[in-house]
Amino acid sequence: MKLKLINSSIIKTLILAFFLVSCSQKNDTRPNIVLLLADDLGYNELGSYGQKIIKTPHIDSLAKKSMMFTDFYAGSPVCSPARAVLLTGKSSSHVSIRGNAAFIRDSVWKQIALDKNEYTLGEMFKEAGYQSAFIGKWHLDTADQAETWAFSHGFDFAAQE
């Protein structure tokens, strides 16, 4: 009798667990979005765009399953403003970062930060229900002000340089 009761309890628990798990899963038809931005990468420097000498098998593999663009222009000729333009969708003359130059204040080097009120891709994706991450070279912050870091601009995860 005890064994029958235990088996019955286990079966009921498994059915309940299955029901709860199946209810929590969503059929999400939105695409996954991975945007790679590389400083100083030319159009023909990837195998997926015709490069024959330099081998880029991992990026080429991603490209086979993805949308590829042929007309993607940097908003600035230097890296920090180009990232600021990409992340905000604004013209380079309308973002707070105009160059890579840092300035000296109280003998401490500080980077010019992206304005905390700038609406970024991270915030846009969050509002659309996506989880987002920024991984790599941010350089749009001041090291001692957390409100200028990537996670403060809508990204759920940030591993920034």
Predicted region positions:
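Formylglycine-dependent sulfatase
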Residues: K2-S9, C23-E161
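Hydrophobic h-region of N-terminal signal peptides that target proteins for export
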Residues: I15-S24
